[in-house]
Amino acid sequence: MAPKIFIDGEHGTTGLQIRTRMADRRDVELLSIPEAERRNAAMREDMLNSADIAILCLPDDASKEAVKMVSANNNVRVIDTSTAFRVHPDWAYGFAEMDKDQGGKITSARFVANPGCYPTGAVALIRPLRAAGILPDGYPVTVNAVSGYTGGGKQMIAQMENADHPDAITAPHFLYGLPLTHKHVPEMTTHGLLDRAPIFSPSVGKFAQGMIVQVPLHLDNLAEGATMESIHAALVGHFAGQDVVQVVSLAESRALPRINAVELAGKDTMKLFVFGTPGTSQVNLVALLDNLGKGASGAAVQNMDLMLSA
């Protein structure tokens, strides 16, 4: 019998993407509530408790409510795509390539917190350097990023695509999170193994899908002897043996005139780059991904497949 999957919130941006990815699969059975019954709490609870895996695509508070509905039913495993449980010690963090054993933790977990899009890129760049001892305690990390507007969900999609929207956004590029309290900062801090919160400056561009995350570093404030080459080697070693995260060679990176934010749109992979000029004291680390792919729905399906492989 095929395992039953229920996407709670299947009509939102992330839920729709997950459902589209699974539309042609015959190895799972998708449970669904008719859109007209979305607010039928009894039907929703029944669906949650009938699933082998429930994928929650809900706001934080609604996700917490859904988890309570299945907490006593050990037959139901959960993937949550909100920020509610991403730093919770009892939840596996759903970035399978983060460490060599992370995929195994996801496979055996009952509860998996799907990573945020920005933290996926930031953690991929920062954690290997912390693990290798290159990025010292107390380093003032800065993370700059630009995302496709689909990361803002249905509301922002309407604002960006409908000029008649009462709160239409016409800017081709804009900063937000200006008070430096973005909800992804705790996630970056925890899973980046940082002892102080990074400064995070997010922005949105007038393109639907895609993302660039940047972490600039001063070499003379890193561990003694740190170079562009040693940083690149740390990334290569950390992500060796898998095919989702690609560390682009220094030679290939040097030949690039620009980075295209939408290059990986529609894909579930991620590319990492190390930029700089040999002999100087600065480097810029860059992650390239699809905010709805490896940054959201693609990761959720990957985590589901790992859990089903147990």
Swiss-Prot record:
Pathway the protein takes part in: Amino-acid biosynthesis; L-arginine biosynthesis; N(2)-acetyl-L-ornithine from L-glutamate: step 3/4
Gene3D superfamilies for the chain: Dihydrodipicolinate Reductase, domain 2, NAD(P)-binding Rossmann-like Domain
Keyword list, A-Z: Amino-acid biosynthesis, Arginine biosynthesis, Cytoplasm, NADP, Oxidoreductase
GO terms for cellular component: cytoplasm
Catalysed reactions, semicolon-separated: N-acetyl-L-glutamate 5-semialdehyde + phosphate + NADP(+) = N-acetyl-L-glutamyl 5-phosphate + NADPH + H(+)
E.C. numbers: 1.2.1.38
Active site (record annotation): 117
Protein name according to UniProt: N-acetyl-gamma-glutamyl-phosphate reductase
Endpoints of the signal sequence: none
PANTHER family per record: N-ACETYL-GAMMA-GLUTAMYL-PHOSPHATE REDUCTASE, CHLOROPLASTIC-RELATED (PTHR32338:SF10), N-ACETYL-GAMMA-GLUTAMYL-PHOSPHATE REDUCTASE, CHLOROPLASTIC-RELATED-RELATED (PTHR32338)
GO BP, one annotated term: L-arginine biosynthetic process
InterPro entries the UniProt entry points to: AGPR_AS, AGPR_type-2, NAD(P)-bd_dom_sf, NAGSA_dehydrogenase, Semialdehyde_DH_NAD-bd
Keyword Cytoplasm found: yes
Cellular localization per UniProt: Cytoplasm
